[in-house]
UniProtKB/Swiss-Prot annotation:
Subunit field text: Interacts with TTC17.
Tissue: Strongly expressed in round and elongating spermatids, weakly in pachytene spermatocytes. Expressed in Leydig cells (at protein level). Expressed in testis, placenta, prostate and lung, and moderately in ovary and brain.
Disordered: region residues: 1-21, 361-387
Disease: Spermatogenic failure 54: An autosomal recessive male infertility disorder characterized by oligoteratoasthenozoospermia. Semen analysis shows markedly reduced sperm counts and severely reduced or absent sperm motility.
InterPro entries in UniProt: CATIP_N, DD_CATIP
Record function comment: Plays a role in primary ciliogenesis by modulating actin polymerization.
Outcome after substituting F35I: In SPGF54; reduces the protein stability. Increases the kinetics of actin polymerisation
Biased composition (Basic and acidic residues): 376-387
Alphabetically ordered keywords of this record: Cell membrane, Cilium biogenesis/degradation, Cytoplasm, Cytoskeleton, Disease variant, Membrane, Nucleus
Example of a GO cellular component annotation carried by this entry: nucleus
Biased composition (Polar residues): 1-10
Gene Ontology BP, a term: cilium organization
Protein name per the record: Ciliogenesis-associated TTC17-interacting protein
């Protein structure tokens, strides 16, 4: 398998223009930044739910399904500190012209939809040359690091770009876009003349806009429902703009999604129960009972109580960390699709990008394939041994 490393984003690393070929980076306007600043925690609480849509062709034939989930989660920062965040997981799988395709998205966001970390992956099983693309976005100190890899057949190309954090105010990642659409549906409005920032398909910084297309009544599961239509447009640096229309119910559920120029669409098949307010269940309270060590029945009863408490605690942990289920689900999906000979190495390569202590990729290419396993030696000992 051949491997290539390419460098992109020279404008991003040296963002001061030095000539006519080096243009300044685009900037979000005040309307976009003010809209993001207006978000508050109580509003976001109403947006925590999952949904599933069917992917259909222009003739109505089923092609696959799309799942979107937004939950409250926890994010481990570089120094090991845990902070609360918005966890976004989306995935789709289906067929495109009878060829298997799919994608997956994992994102961690702040309450102002600032990006903490995001990983995306999509593939198309072309008969002659299968293609797979991966992109990772990570906030590193005062930089946004973007790592892209494209695999066509056995050839892999990798590129790393960094943007100054101060230059991406108003940046909307793929994960943030899914949350922002729910906010617009809840408010029933789109910020007027707002111009956000995003990345195009080539990983270049560009403008992102939203347009209010008004209200429409559609039929969902034999029911009439009013939807709020928002058109999102990515103004790529090169090529024509890419637009997508979202038909949103009053609480943010997605009823329909249309990619402008694409023959198919995603539609909801069952009318959800529209949310009005979020009900937070109180945490279970377990009373401490005095333990009489002389009585075996009391000791056994205490054992059973403690066992139940641990079981509920484990279930509560999984509810608070939905990324655990999402990661395992994506891993099993790609394991079934790829069917690698070495499952252990495949698992190490899949979960490697989520390791906070994983060393960064070298800037220069190498003929040696990087080892996906973490060294058992501490970094300091390894250096001293090499010396």
């Amino acid at each position: 398998m051949s491997s290539k490393v390419y460098s992109t984003g020279s404008r991003a690393k040296d963002h001061q223009p030095s000539g006519p070929e080096c243009l300044p980076l685009p900037e979000a306007n005040a309307e976009a930044i003010d809209f993001l600043s207006s978000l508050h925690k109580e509003e976001l609480q109403m947006l925590f739910f999952s949904e599933t849509l069917a992917m259909v062709s222009d003739t109505g034939e089923p092609q696959g399904e799309l799942t979107i989930e937004v939950q409250r989660g926890k994010y481990q920062e570089k120094l090991g500190m845990l902070t609360y965040c918005l966890f976004v997981h989306a995935s789709s799988r289906g067929f495109l012209d009878k060829m298997l395709c799919g994608n997956s998205l994992l994102g961690y966001l702040s309450e102002k939809l600032e990006l903490m970390e995001q990983h995306s992956q999509d593939f198309i099983k072309f008969l002659i040359l299968p293609m797979e693309r991966k992109m990772s976005l990570l906030k590193q100190d005062d930089q946004l690091a973007v790592t892209r890899s494209i695999k066509e057949g056995e050839e892999v190309k990798t590129g790393v770009t960094s943007f100054p954090w101060s230059s991406i105010k108003g940046f909307i990642s793929e994960a943030a876009n899914l949350v922002l659409l729910r906010v617009m549906a809840w408010r029933r409005m789109v910020p007027s003349n707002a111009r956000f920032l995003t990345l195009d398909t080539e990983g270049k910084l560009c403008y992102l806009t939203y347009q209010n297309l008004g209200f429409q009544t559609i039929q969902v599961d034999h029911q009439q429902a009013e939807v709020f239509i928002v058109e999102q447009t990515v103004h790529a640096e090169e090529g024509i703009p890419m637009s997508c229309q979202y038909y949103l119910l009053s609480d943010g559920h997605l009823a329909k999604r249309i990619q402008v120029g694409s023959p198919g669409c995603c539609i909801i098949t069952k009318m959800p129960i529209l949310r009005e307010e979020d009900e937070i269940e109180p945490r279970p309270v377990f009373e401490k009972k005095p333990l009489v060590w002389e009585e075996d029945m009391e000791l056994y009863s205490k054992f059973l109580d403690r066992k139940e408490e641990l079981r509920l605690g484990h279930a509560s942990y999984l509810r608070q960390h939905p990324e655990a289920h999402a990661l395992i689900s994506d891993f099993l999906l790609f394991l079934l699709l790829r069917q690698p000979e070495d499952v252990v190495t495949f698992a190490a390569e899949f979960f490697g990008p989520f390791d906070p202590w994983r060393p960064s990729s070298p800037a220069l290419g190498s003929s040696h394939r990087p080892n996906p396993f973490r060294s058992l030696e501490p970094e300091g000992d390894a250096r001293s041994g090499a010396a």
